[in-house]
Amino acid sequence: MKKNLISNHIQLNDSGKLIHLLGLEGLSKQHLTHILDKADSLIDTSGNLKKSKALDDMSIANLFFEPSTRTRNTFEIAAMRSSANVINVDLANSALKKNEDLLDTMRTLKAMQIDMFVIRHKQNGLPHHVAKYLEGVSILNAGDGINAHPTQALLDMLSIRQHKKTFENLSVAIVGDIIHSRVAHSGIQALKTLGTTDIRLIAPKILQYNSEPCSEVSCFDDIEPGLKDCDVVIVLRLQKERMIEANIPNEQEYFNNFGLTPKRLALTKSDAIVMHPGPINRGVEIDSIVADGNQSIILQQVTDGIAIRMAVMQILANKS
């Protein structure tokens, strides 16, 4: 896997409590479990999200430099359901278009009494850089390049825990564009921290890690043996925007070789769950019958994403 870009002391205060969420590397099982437990407490017995006044004295700014539907909207809803004031910064018409440095823009917003920034950016490590030089606010990484997507990994862990109860003895397959996926990078870290030892990465060799210690994960370039008796299947899309044109697979050929079809899903355990971080490309990485089937928990992941983001915001604000 790639080199860790997170200096963990930046994420934690002297008491070991989270003040930023930049990535999951170096965070303990206790840290992750605390977030999952907090998120669970924000979901009622009917599966509906509770409202909270926890952040009613706070202002949160969303800075999304990459397109997003699920992540941006769930962060906004999470902040609103926690009673925070939310600002979606109009980057297309901001001073950044006049070549203002991002840190200067954020310092200006901080002077407007912003307490927390949610950042998505194509540059690996940018939220870490901002957290290092911008004091007095919390930084929440909503995805940086191919490096990390901590809240997606956490919401995936929440969804898994709701169905499987424990992470030990699980077999988890991650299928798709592994090398370009920040979801895979953070998800593997979360699974290992929570005790999962059978993690299987399934992808064409060109989309697989160049190197990965065999003691940590198993790598497959054939989907069928990789899926055998799995408890959880996480499907990833082809991230064409991050690929060199010559390396972009033919979609039909990819589906024929690596698409999750009902026949292939039948190789997993009968109670296996199917997950996808979205957006879904039907007929490329997953068959619609599987995406909409009774083993799919894709829409539950979206709801769980709001709960996780509420939990993280409240924890960062020292409200939990």
Swiss-Prot record:
Residues engaged in binding L-aspartate: 98, 182, 237
Family annotation (PROSITE patterns): CARBAMOYLTRANSFERASE
Associated pathway: Pyrimidine metabolism; UMP biosynthesis via de novo pathway; (S)-dihydroorotate from bicarbonate: step 2/3
The keyword Electron transport belongs to this UniProt entry's keyword annotation: no
Ligand binding (carbamoyl phosphate): 70-71, 120, 149, 152, 278-279
Catalytic reaction equation(s): carbamoyl phosphate + L-aspartate = N-carbamoyl-L-aspartate + phosphate + H(+)
Molecular function terms, GO-annotated: amino acid binding; aspartate carbamoyltransferase activity
Gene3D superfamilies from the UniProt entry: Aspartate/ornithine carbamoyltransferase
Keyword Nucleotide-binding: no
Record SUPFAM superfamilies: Aspartate/ornithine carbamoyltransferase (SSF53671)
Transmembrane intervals: none
Cellular component GO terms held in the UniProt record: cytosol
Gene Ontology BP, a term: 'de novo' UMP biosynthetic process
Its EC number(s): 2.1.3.2
Enzymatic class: transferase
Record keywords: Pyrimidine biosynthesis, Transferase
NCBIfam families cross-referenced by the UniProt entry: asp_carb_tr (TIGR00670), PRK00856.1 (NF002032)
Description of how the protein assembles with itself and partners: Heterododecamer (2C3:3R2) of six catalytic PyrB chains organized as two trimers (C3), and six regulatory PyrI chains organized as three dimers (R2).
Family, as annotated: Belongs to the aspartate/ornithine carbamoyltransferase superfamily. ATCase family.
Name of protein: Aspartate carbamoyltransferase catalytic subunit
Species, as recorded: Vesicomyosocius okutanii subsp. Calyptogena okutanii (strain HA)
Lineage, highest ranks first: Bacteria, Pseudomonadati, Pseudomonadota, Gammaproteobacteria, Candidatus Pseudothioglobaceae
Gene: pyrB
